[in-house]
Regions:
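Bacterial Sec-dependent N-terminal signal peptides
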Residues: 1-22, 278
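Extended soluble regions of mature proteins
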Residues: 20-284
Length: 284
């Protein structure tokens, strides 16, 4: 029995060691987003966790995004193109700074944020959420803390961008007790190094690689495709169309382009000056 257990542990260790850690990559993705008919739905409740509060989509039903992701060491850059406009997010993990650039309706603008800005904004949001939860509990409405995500690995496989991928399901439950499932197709052969930022840019930038999905960072591999539906009706489908590992990427790729009016995140609109409110059409 001990010999059998040792062999199992040895086999598991071999699999873990065989998983490649990638510190340079060029990734192309296609993301389809279907906006909710009612942006102020159940996701707006305290702890909904869907992150779509306060969004104004200007009557648009959806958005298709074509993105190119450059990753090298501590730097991640996401270039996204859609009918709405162009978007660039550059994340510098070494200096703990993220710059988001937008080109829409002939205007070039952007904002930058630091890790401290993110912590301050999160603390403010947590405080607002706690006050709302307290108000509901005083009304006799129980709001439970969000449960840890449950990841179910399956043996289903399919090929994506030339790679054999496996299927996993992430089950999450929000504070209202609503259960949602996200289907992930991942490649178990490699993961990105620690410097890779799945949260680049927040909002739509986050949606590219699922950085906003609870449990995504726990997947034992690299996400190649996912489908998610929020409790307010918002849907996101992302698929990797091309991936080049150990790509040759010039450092100039990560330089901030000229011609943009860039401000600190604290001066941008949205709750707490966070620059996170994503408005599609209409006035700010």
């Amino acid at each position: 029995m001990k010999r059998f257990s040792f062999l199992i542990m040895l086999l598991f260790s071999t699999v873990v060691l065989a998983q490649k850690v990638v510190d340079k990559a060029l990734i192309k993705t296609q993301t389809e987003i279907v906006f909710p008919e009612n942006p102020g739905g159940s996701a707006a409740a305290p702890g909904g966790g869907d992150g779509e509060r306060g969004m104004n989509f200007g009557g648009m039903s959806g958005l298709d995004l074509t993105s190119t992701i450059y990753f090298k060491g501590d730097m991640t850059k996401i270039e996204s193109t859609s009918d709405f406009g162009n978007n660039i997010t550059i994340t510098d993990r070494k200096n703990r700074k993220t710059t988001t650039l937008m080109e829409m309706m002939g205007k070039k603008m952007g904002f930058y944020s630091t890790d401290e800005d993110e912590k301050t904004m999160k603390a403010r949001q947590d405080s607002i959420r706690a006050k709302r939860t307290d108000s509901l509990q005083k009304m006799g409405i129980n709001v439970a803390p969000p449960a840890a995500p449950e990841i179910i690995y399956t043996e289903e496989t399919k090929k994506i961008a030339g790679y054999n991928c496996k299927k996993a399901i992430i089950k999450t439950k929000n504070r209202q007790g609503e259960v949602s499932e996200t289907t992930i197709w991942y490649n178990p052969e490699f993961k990105m190094a620690e410097g890779f930022s799945m949260n680049a840019g927040g909002g739509m930038g986050r949606a590219m690689m699922g950085g906003g999905l609870n449990g995504m960072d726990q997947i034992n591999g690299f996400p190649m495709e996912y489908d998610v539906q929020r409790s307010n009706g918002m849907k996101v489908h992302m698929v990797v169309t091309k991936i080049q590992l150990d790509a040759t990427i010039d450092d100039k790729i990560f330089e901030i382009p000229k011609g943009y009016d860039i401000k600190p995140m604290s001066e941008m609109g949205g709750p707490g000056g966070g620059g996170r409110v994503f408005r599609m059409g209409g006035e700010n």
